[in-house]
Amino acid sequence: MITYDLKGKTALVTGGASGIGFATATVLAKAGAAVAINHLADDPRGPEAVAKLHAMTGARVISAPGNVGDAADGPRMVEQAVADLGRLDYLVNNAGTPATRTTIAPHELDRLTEEVWHTLLQVNLLGVFRCAKAAAPALRAARGAVVSTASIAGINHAGSSMAYGATKAGVISLTKNLARGLSPEVRVNAVAPGAVDSTWMIEWTNEQRASSIDNALLKRRCTPEDIAEVIVFLLAGAAMVTGQTIVVDGGLTT
């Protein structure tokens, strides 16, 4: 893994209490950055993650409770995190949801309710826009960077539902347009993970678990750390990369 010296830098990681978010926060903190971990206000994993990461790294780690899927709470959370950190160099839009615990196949249209669509759009797509918009002044001042978590479901893979895939395709499109809108001061990119070992796989069938390995060229699933490595590269390195989505799936979609 490439290492960076991020002393004096700050980062806000949404959905940072577990999985890809916590792995990314860990890499940033180990490199010396001060990190704000966003989590839902009633999620006990948030304060636990903050305490754990501070103990692991000695870095400044703060809690940033709030719901990115809420039109008022999301921007409020970002503004408070920026105020607490004093500046903002990096925004990681990682918070997301599948909205359902089980896969909704393309032919199961009746299961794709308005409620499912609303939840997915509010969190996965509008949440990304809200956070980027709220963070834009601070990011411009710092000449910072944004990385959002998309998915191979937004490109050419089934994902948990067609609605989930549509929101992730939206993140990919939004990434290009935010890169235009925030240039030249801020770089904006995305990662599109494939199958990742995480709590999202709890409801997967044995067949789904096996196929996610068998169909990948590298014959393993991604770990949260695999994705975090690319996210931090896009934040702290990759000085001439913007508006791009990097697929990290071990060759699953190749």
PLM features per residue range, with description:
Residues 151:
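Residue(s) in the substrate-gating loop at a strand-loop-helix junction
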Residues 102-118, 201, 212:
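Substrate-binding pocket helix/loop in short-chain dehydrogenase/reductase
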Residues 43-44, 65-78, 114, 225-226:
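The beta1-alpha1 cofactor-binding region of Rossmann-like NAD(H)/NADP(H)-dependent oxidoreductases
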Residues 10, 17-19:
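Conserved glycine-rich cofactor-binding loop
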Residues 33-48:
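Conserved glycine-rich Rossmann-like NAD(P)H-binding loop of the short-chain dehydrogenase/reductase
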Residues 89, 110-129, 147, 171, ...:
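Catalytic Tyr-X3-Lys loop
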Residues 132, 167, 175:
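Active-site helix of classical SDR
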Residues 132, 138-140, 183, 220-248, ...:
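C-terminal substrate-recognition "lid" of short-chain dehydrogenase/reductases
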